Amino acid sequence: MARRTSFVDEDRIRDNLVSLIRIPSVTGDEDAAVSHIANWLQQFDAEIDYWNDGIASLQRDPRYPGHEVERAWAPVVVGVLRGEQPGPSVLLTGHVDVVPPGDYANWNDEPFSGVARGDRIHGCGASDMKAGLVAAMAVFEAFAESGRNFPGRIIFAAVPAEEDSGLGTLAAIRGGWDADACIIPEPTLGANGIPELVIAHAGAMSLKINVPGKSAHASKRLQGESALDHFMTIYEAMREDERKLNEAVEHPLMKVHPLPYATNVGTIHGGLWSSSVMDSLEAQVRVGVALGETIDEAEARFHDAIMDHIKDDPWLSQNPPRIRRLASGFGSAETKQDHPLVAALAESAEEEFRTTTPIAAAPYGCDMSGWVRHANVPTVIYGPGEIEQAHAPNESVSLEATCKVARTLVKTTERLLDMHVDELRAHKQVSAAG
């Protein structure tokens, strides 16, 4: 019988990837992409679960992570292949949503073109993470077409809203989906062309900071209180908090990053007129959450750092900023390095790439957090995209790397399914931070 990896077809991967890129599934508008994948699943003799989880219901869930983009629901599709014998359940999952492409003038091609040049497929979401999603689809396809002579279950889930706090993964978990091991093919390809196996990631949360000022005529600027000037005082506190947090890093996989836990000011809005002193300012800020730190603890740390910094400021001590969490964001997460999932994937990757698989931790948050924290599913990240390409103009991905990752994940899934359920579940205790 042919090896399952022989069912990984480069032409089909290219076609599926181009088709997905051409669907402009900006977060909040993922229905067409999820529907496309649901239709793709229908060609296989698979169980399909396709539903919309209403936002009102999600908001009542105590695990609700918040959301920034307006939406009425979260569309999710799950496909399941059941083997001929009982055994473990392996989940391959990824998000369909992409960030807005920004100014089209910064792109060489239309952002959702899916143009192929040599080995690179171009388009918004190519690396983050439609290539990874297509690699997972190729795994599902390989098992569907090679027969059911395997134990256990293979579960494929396409979710929305990863770019908006992981709301889609919570919807999948609320739908009753669970597994003994989970792989998320987010972008982990290194500069050397070898994907890293990510077993831990930092968390992140979004905050809104409103800074009060006092208006005055620009010619009498000293009679006013510039909200921009006062924001710069707050900015100093933010940078000091970031410095202290990163100086305290002890996790060996996190210490290799120049800035494991980053704080970033993403937007600033303020003022009404060039000839008036700015009387208010609103900033949206992304704050890193350390491994072992809960989101609530991170928020308190950030808030206390600012309030301590401004306590002697004549204006801000009497007119403090309002700091409000926009969304809970992603908690940090970790799967222990001795978990059988890590060994299975590392061995499979070494067979495919002919080199040692680097084990790593990521400085960003993703859907791994939801599966680890809310479903207690051991989860790792391993995919063909490059994080340097993510959220950037002229995003692209290597077709060759996508095919290699797909074959790696086929081999990994085979190894996991051949394990005894108890072997995986005995290791199901994972490290998670809220």
PLM segments and residue spans:
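Metal-dependent amide/peptide-bond hydrolase catalytic core
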Residues: 1-11, 71, 188, 192, ...
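Acidic/His- and Gly-rich active-site-bordering loop/insert found
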Residues: 2-121, 145, 150, 376, ...
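Short beta-strand segments
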Residues: 93-94, 157-158, 183-186, 210-212, ...
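Glycine/serine-rich anion-binding loops at beta->alpha junctions
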Residues: 119-134, 217
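Acidic/histidine-rich catalytic neighborhood of metal-dependent amide-processing enzymes
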Residues: 127-200, 417, 424
